[in-house]
């Protein structure tokens, strides 16, 4: 038996979210085919073209989000809570396309979501300078965006960096997580993990994905397992701060 679910639920379990009753540590993780690399982008009409201008802005940037538990909302809350960026989060949109349309219509200044889809949604607006990518909320700098600063580098303390990693970066990395049933024999688990990884690195598979404009940016089952374990090892004080930042206010 195999399953795929939104890895953000793992953080939800750590935070004690109602309705998330399964112990995520009991699942066996096969891997992730593509990680989300979250960035924040703003329309030029916002008057903010880079993160330094954002820090200095007396007007909060109006960002669109879907709902709590979705990266569009959670990342906005996390960068506001850890970096102190002025943000007004507007939630209730049904998808990132709705957010894009609202930003293009002037209802929003911008949003934070996966670069893998944001660069397609604004494929003309970004090169034209109508939309500026101002922040990367990622574990490492994206090759496409060498001059865009990372949130981790702007954080002023180890605690802020840990909060960003646990509340924004790790959930995005494991958002499409493949699992199998608990307590399967270790030998079988290793076979499944190797097959999963082999598929995602197969030259023909990668070539077909590229033709279809599908990004392949995998994590192994072992890497996912470590990420999950790290989330469950967070201290009660950090979990409390995460819950406070991500709470609807």
Where are these regions (language model features)?
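An extracytoplasmic/periplasmic, membrane-proximal ligand-sensing/linker region
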Residues: 129-130, 134, 154-156, 183-249
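Residue-level detector of anion-binding/catalytic polar loops
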Residues: 86, 109, 215
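Ligand-binding "clamshell"
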Residues: 14-28, 85-87, 120-136, 144-161, ...
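Short helices/loops that flank or line small-molecule/ion binding pockets
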Residues: 78, 82, 97-111, 116, ...
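Hinge/capping helix and adjacent helix->loop/strand transition within the periplasmic-binding protein
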Residues: 1, 7-98, 102-105, 155-163, ...
